A protein has these predicted regions:
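N-terminal secretory signal peptides that target proteins for export/translocation
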Residues: 1-10
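Short, hydrophobic alpha-helical membrane anchors of single-pass surface/secreted proteins
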Residues: 12-15
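Hydrophobic helical h-region of N-terminal Sec-dependent signal peptides
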Residues: 17-22
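C-terminal motif of bacterial Sec signal peptides marking the signal peptidase cleavage site
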Residues: 28-30
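Active-site histidine-anchored catalytic micro-motif
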Residues: 32-281, 285-292
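Long, Lys/Arg- and hydrophobic-enriched amphipathic alpha-helices
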Residues: 288-311
């Protein structure tokens, strides 16, 4: 009997060890299929819990308020020029690039920020919106859709879905929102996430629906990380290729690219087409990769970044 108990106990310990090893390996796999492995990746999101009705989403989970303040501290808040569209990273490692580009686009003086980013889970409708507010560093950011019933109705009459749950751990919106909350806490946001499969036709319809809001007091913030799964040198090369495609307005070609080029091909292509209809010209502000932040000795896969303005 004792031998049987010992055998069962050993089997139990073996199974427990296997479960722990499996759990550890799953915990190290990054935040999703479109993110690269390595130190520069985003952590796995926590399980989504139901938000408290009417409460803002805390930006602290995306970027700590003290880190936002540190990034913003050396940057001037006022710029003479303003932009209609700005493309920024949502990887917190490159928050200085995002902050600088937002400020250079005139974010301190805008009334509305339409933040459009990739749906990293790549689930649900091709376009999803939220009417939940955000809060960063004690500064609340109101959501335009919380009170603008006409815009919400116009958006959701098409194929767009209203789903606050999809935004609870979505850093493509949360990271830029954490910066905007401290740059311009009196502004409003309108968060939108798009699946990779977003078509140019769906993108055109989205911008057509948003047209009544797109004036000089609105800034479109396209939240995009560029190449994934490549070495530092290869990622630099992809940045050059992407810059050329964007400056040449090759939207159809961009829409067909994979995550070794960017994480939001459909959305970026739709944005490029909208910019062309408005006769806006792209200017590349900065190019970088995660290796630029992590040091020359970093030889694992990296994410790359571009900041772009459209005027």
């Amino acid at each position: 009997v004792k031998n049987v108990k010992r055998t069962r106990h050993k089997k139990y310990l073996l199974m427990l060890s296997l479960v722990m090893i499996l759990g550890l390996s799953l915990g190290l796999t990054g935040c999703g299929q479109w993110e690269s492995m390595g130190a520069e990746t985003h952590p796995s999101p926590d399980p989504v819990s139901s938000p408290v009705e009417g409460s803002p989403l805390d930006c602290e989970k995306f970027m700590a308020a003290k880190d936002v303040a540190r990034v913003l501290a050396p940057l001037p808040r006022e710029y003479e020029e303003q932009a209609e569209i700005v493309v920024v990273p949502h990887h917190a490692l490159a928050a200085d690039m995002t902050a600088e580009a937002l400020l250079q686009a005139g974010a301190a003086d805008k009334d509305l920020f339409i933040i459009i980013g990739p749906n990293h889970a790549n689930q649900g409708a091709n376009i999803i919106v939220s009417n939940q507010g955000y809060e960063g560093g004690g500064h609340p950011l109101k959501n335009r859709l919380a009170w603008d019933d006409a815009t919400l109705e116009a958006l959701t009459q098409e194929s767009t879905l209203l789903d606050n749950h999809s935004f609870q751990n979505e850093h493509s919106i949360g990271m830029p929102a954490s910066l905007i909350a401290q740059i311009n806490p009196h502004g409003e946001i309108l968060p939108i996430i798009c699946r990779r499969e977003l078509t140019l036709e769906e993108g055109a319809q989205l911008f057509s629906t948003l047209a009544p809001l797109l004036d000089e007091d609105t800034l479109i913030v396209a939240s995009v990380d560029f190449s994934h799964h490549l070495s530092g040198p290869d990622a630099q090369g992809r940045n050059e290729q992407m810059a050329e495609l964007i400056q040449a307005g090759k939207s159809a070609q961009v829409s067909r690219l994979d995550s070794t080029y960017l994480d939001a091909p459909g959305m970026m292509a739709a944005l490029m087409e909208y910019a062309q209809t408005q006769q806006l010209t792209p200017t590349i502000l900065r190019k970088a990769t995660a290796a630029d932040y992590l040091g020359t000795g970093y030889d694992r896969e990296v994410t790359s970044y571009l900041t772009i303005q459209y005027r």
